[in-house]
């Protein structure tokens, strides 16, 4: 599936919704336990030492591996032509839509996205 340039373009008009908190957490791999609450609509993920917003300690992850773009009603994952690929639902993808508790893999690192309404103080509602 082709992905709009707007996901990678920093001036795309993407915006975080004010009624939800979106978090990406490492659930398996050497960076296990790392949690990052998204504070902007375009967030890059890559290997430690690179210029990515979220840095993963995994040699199989490219310095700029993928980007997560957020609109009001959608969270999008887009591979940035990484060497080892981005995987969602056990398939290598160029792009994928993520929902609450969607898991994806970069190298040997597994991550999960959580989308929680802001009026909940924690994620125990699910």
Regions found by a protein language model. Give the residues of each.
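Intrinsically disordered, low-complexity acidic Ser/Thr-rich regulatory segments
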Residues: 1-59, 69, 118-126
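Forkhead-associated
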Residues: 34-110
């Amino acid at each position: 599936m082709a992905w709009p340039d707007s996901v990678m373009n920093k001036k795309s008009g993407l915006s975080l919704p004010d009624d939800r908190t979106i978090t990406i957490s490492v659930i398996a791999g050497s960076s296990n336990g790392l949690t990052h609450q998204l504070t902007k609509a375009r967030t890059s993920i890559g290997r430690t030492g690179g210029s990515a917003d979220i840095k993963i300690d995994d040699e199989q992850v490219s310095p700029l591996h993928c980007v997560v773009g957020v609109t009001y009603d959608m969270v999008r994952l887009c591979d940035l032509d990484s060497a080892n690929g981005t995987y969602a639902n056990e398939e290598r993808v160029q792009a994928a839509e993520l929902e609450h508790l969607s898991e994806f893999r970069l190298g040997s690192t597994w991550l999960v996205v959580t989308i929680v309404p802001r009026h909940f103080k924690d994620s125990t509602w699910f």
